[in-house]
Amino acid sequence: MKRIYSYNNQEHILYLVATPIGNLEDMTFRAVNVLKSVDRIYAEDTRNSKVLLERYDIKTPLYTYHEFNKELKEDEIVDFIKKGASVAIISDAGLPVISDPGFDIAKRCIKEDIPVTPIPGASAGISALIASGLPPKPFMFYGFLDSKTTKRKQELEALKYLPYTT
């Protein structure tokens, strides 16, 4: 992975941009600036993302990138970045990659020596932790539980014995 010495908006880069998790005013100045300056934004659900982009007068072209098309979109995104473009990935709420699309494209970009820069912001897991009254150390984020009841019960049973706030 390449070390980045400047955090000014760049070309040939993938940004993973955090979005608000419930209040549109939780959007950071930096996130707005990045989304205005990139060549394309790829979003989990463009219908949800349009509300955010309109709120901050972001006119950057918006494309879909989600669980069901990510394999098709990876080549498109990587090729676009290699031609000199900058791209941002956003999820519906919170941080891309964390229980949302983004891991595969970030991994691919790193493999191809394309810089990947996170633009931090709201995080549901950390927000819940700091308001919970539970010990913050050690802490483990597990992610979404399985949608199937039997599997979900098995996951919860295994998690309850961990020595972490989970």
Predicted regions and their residues:
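Beta-strand/loop-alpha-helix module characteristic of Rossmann-like adenine-cofactor folds
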Residues: 2-4, 11-12, 127-166
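Short active-site oxyanion
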Residues: 35-41, 113-117, 166
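Conserved helicase motor
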Residues: 63-72, 144-149
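Loop/turn-to-beta-strand initiation segments
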Residues: 13-14, 83-88, 164-165
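Short glycine-cluster motifs
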Residues: 83-140
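Glycine-rich, flexible N-terminal cofactor/catalytic loop recognition
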Residues: 1-68
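Short phosphate-binding loop-to-helix
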Residues: 67-82, 101
